Amino acid sequence: MAKHLFTSESVSEGHPDKIADQISDAVLDAILEQDPKARVACETYVKTGMVLVGGEITTSAWVDIEEITRNTVREIGYVHSDMGFDANSCAVLSAIGKQSPDINQGVDRADPLEQGAGDQGLMFGYATNETDVLMPAPITYAHRLVQRQAEVRKNGSLPWLRPDAKSQVTFQYDDGKIVGIDAVVLSTQHSEDIDQKSLQEAVMEEIIKPVLPTEWLNASTKFFINPTGRFVIGGPMGDCGLTGRKIIVDTYGGMARHGGGAFSGKDPSKVDRSAAYAARYVAKNIVAAGLADRCEIQVSYAIGVAEPTSIMVETFGTEKLPTEQLTLLVREFFDLRPYGLIQMLDLLHPIYKETAAYGHFGREHFPWEKTDKAAVLRDAAGLK
């Protein structure tokens, strides 16, 4: 492989689409806390002064949608009209219905192991050994930049920062290996009382330099900090936000394929979410076991059917044993039926709000990031 560039982007928790994702997952968590078997498909729309929460929810739980919404927006940091959005005064509208019984009859079964998939669809999982968390470097460092932006905003180090921000990092590869960072873009919302030069210097010193490894930076690395020159109007005042609009940010930054289904607001019976988590778990354990340097898993389902309609393993020529054998190992050691993967990853808990900003993958405390199958896979493969 020749030299090439690869770019990934991320957005902060204060980005309008991410506000929507976090509200949807906060509602999901509140319901799962009371009713782990609830069926939840919660969508959120945010715009200046308004939040609309809709979807289909079937549950025995009662939750206060308005309070959950305001608390989520408040935690993100939109607490004053000067920021273009205020948790205390925004309107909160609710349009919640129940899950169709036609769907429900295809999912629920007397035998839990026969629980059908909540919909048809295809999902991908990916892992690579180019970072310690077995994620692609471009998306990993794009996330870390906007996480750092939120950190210095919330701890008061840079009090003129506002919640909305975006990052983008372009890595240089040579023969598939990282050799440097070619370009960094960071745009952050800010108050009126900071000039462009001071902002750029502070962002470089307090956000970019603490995050990006110096060995990947060189004299030709380009930095674009608030390149338009002004970013005062942001958040839902600048753009409307919708749940499920940042699916590449949520996953692998474009380095792997995507089945198209969003995650936030969906309970684990929706394979769009749970099977994508399981596919990451499978791919990560294959790479952690040393069976491949890169691994992409595809699974697919039919609505109401428990067994996956297909499982594919792609290792991009980095495999240490034939992919046919890898596929057999996946089928042997991972239960990818909807109920099986829910049990395997212990998904019926309120753990989802935290996933809704800074990526669903590559953060070690989530259950789908465990590498507890790596040793058994390696033994079964006969590798020393």
From Swiss-Prot:
Cofactors required: Mg(2+); K(+)
InterPro entries listed in its UniProt record: ADOMET_SYNTHASE_CS, S-AdoMet_synt_C, S-AdoMet_synt_central, S-AdoMet_synt_N, S-AdoMet_synthetase, S-AdoMet_synthetase_sfam
Keyword flag Metal-binding: yes
Protein EC: 2.5.1.6
Residues noted as binding L-methionine in the record, renumbered to the chain: 56, 99, 239, 270
Gene Ontology BP terms: one-carbon metabolic process; S-adenosylmethionine biosynthetic process
MF (Gene Ontology): ATP binding; magnesium ion binding; methionine adenosyltransferase activity
Bridged cysteine pairs (disulfide): none
Gene Ontology CC: one annotated term: cytoplasm
Catalytic activity: L-methionine + ATP + H2O = S-adenosyl-L-methionine + phosphate + diphosphate
Binding, ATP: 15, 164-166, 230-231, 239, 245-246, 262, 266
Subcellular location: Cytoplasm
Region (Flexible loop): 99-109
Keywords: ATP-binding, Cytoplasm, Magnesium, Metal-binding, Nucleotide-binding, One-carbon metabolism, Potassium, Transferase
Binding site for K(+): 43
Alphabetical list of Gene3D superfamilies matching this protein: 3.30.300.10
SUPFAM superfamilies tied to this protein: S-adenosylmethionine synthetase
Function: Catalyzes the formation of S-adenosylmethionine (AdoMet) from methionine and ATP. The overall synthetic reaction is composed of two sequential steps, AdoMet formation and the subsequent tripolyphosphate hydrolysis which occurs prior to release of AdoMet from the enzyme.
PANTHER family xref list: S-ADENOSYLMETHIONINE SYNTHETASE
Record's protein name: S-adenosylmethionine synthase
